[in-house]
Amino acid sequence: MFKLLVVVFAALFAAALAVPAPVARANPAPIPIASPEPAPQYYYGASPYAYSGGYYDSPYSYYG
């Protein structure tokens, strides 16, 4: 009986050594969410894009 326990313990120990330890994986980087075009009053100083009405007039409208 004792010999059986030793064999079972040795088999479990060998199996534990054979299986690689789990590696903690880092979380993937979050996908940035683009903000809409800010209101004209939030621009610093006079900007040519402050009162642009066209869709392609402002570089920020691409992300809207």
Swiss-Prot record:
One of its GO terms (molecular function) is neuropeptide hormone activity. Keywords: Neuropeptide, Secreted, Signal. Residues 19-40, 63-64 form a propeptide. It is found in: Secreted. The keyword Lyase does not apply. One of its GO terms (cellular component) is extracellular region. It comes from the Eukaryota. GO terms for biological process: neuropeptide signaling pathway. Residues 1-18 form the signal peptide. Its main location: secreted. This is Neuropeptide-like 4. It comes from Drosophila melanogaster (Fruit fly). The lineage of its organism: Eukaryota, Metazoa, Ecdysozoa, Arthropoda, Hexapoda. The gene is Nplp4.
